[in-house]
């Protein structure tokens, strides 16, 4: 499974260009997407999940062209874990996942089998009778990961999955993504370099709608050597000026 993005542009009605003639190949395995807020990462994921139609350019998923006639076929191949998880707070974990399985059109017996499997894989089996509103942020992310995997997608997209989590939960989520990437392509979007160093062999660095770098983490670190420094100052205006540069 691979994703090919060619000359992709997304321009909004207010004139803002969120993605600017971008090209990218996402291979099988876990692929990192690194960039600051406003770099265009979320817009790219909205395109890849068929939520947003690009202004121009092409995207293909396993040789299937992104077009209105193919969206339903593409959606069956994609699982998505958004940054914010808000899944039916009055339902238990199992009830929530059973409902998501129904929405995905999964046969009852098969749905139960998959739910049991993924609850065990994500260490949620002992919490399946808890209401969603009783779960910690990390547990909610894990439930979100299960719902994204229920229909057995070939391409899993995760948006900032470790943001706001404690160190132990962050490591758990990262390990799960590495595990699930053995059977599918995973796009891991984050602004935390440590997460990508622990999980990805390849990544892309995004800024202002363009990809500044694509390649391995080791190559990126080699390129950065001698070009990174730390400056401590109490002058806020100077700090902002340095940040702009």
Predicted regions and their residues:
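Conserved ABC transporter NBD signature motif
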Residues: 57-67, 73-74
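Helix-to-loop junction immediately C-terminal to a conserved catalytic motif
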Residues: 49
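A short, flexible loop at the N-terminus of ABC-type nucleotide-binding domains that lies
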Residues: 1-5, 9-21, 27, 68-70
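Catalytic Walker B motif of ABC-type/P-loop ATPase nucleotide-binding domains
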Residues: 156-159
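Walker A (P-loop) phosphate-binding loop of ABC-type ATPase nucleotide-binding domains
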Residues: 36-40
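Conserved ABC ATPase "signature" region
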Residues: 98, 102, 109-127
């Amino acid at each position: 499974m691979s994703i090919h993005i060619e000359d992709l542009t997304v321009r909004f009605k207010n004139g803002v260009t969120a993605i600017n003639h971008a090209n990218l190949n996402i291979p099988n395995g876990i692929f990192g997407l690194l960039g600051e807020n406003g770099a265009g990462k979320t817009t790219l994921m909205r395109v890849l999940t068929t939520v947003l139609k690009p202004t121009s350019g092409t995207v293909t998923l396993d040789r299937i062209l992104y077009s209105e006639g193919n969206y339903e076929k593409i959606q069956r191949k994609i699982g998505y874990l958004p940054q914010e998880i808000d899944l039916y707070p009055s339902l238990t974990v199992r009830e929530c996942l059973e409902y998501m399985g129904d929405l995905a059109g999964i046969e009852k017996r098969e749905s139960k089998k998959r739910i049991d499997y993924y609850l065990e894989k994500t260490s949620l089996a002992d919490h399946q009778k808890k209401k969603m509103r009783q779960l910690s942020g990390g547990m909610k992310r894990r439930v979100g990961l299960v719902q994204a995997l229920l229909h057995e997608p070939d391409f899993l997209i995760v948006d900032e999955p470790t943001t706001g989590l404690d160190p132990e939960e962050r490591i758990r989520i990262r390990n799960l993504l590495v595990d699930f990437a053995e059977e599918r392509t995973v796009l891991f979007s984050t602004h935390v370099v440590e997460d990508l160093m622990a999980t990805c062999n390849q990544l892309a660095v995004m800024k202002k709608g363009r990809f500044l770098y694509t390649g391995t983490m080791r190559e990126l670190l080699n390129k950065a050597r001698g070009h990174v420094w730390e400056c401590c100052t109490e002058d806020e205006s100077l700090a902002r000026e340095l940040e702009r540069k």
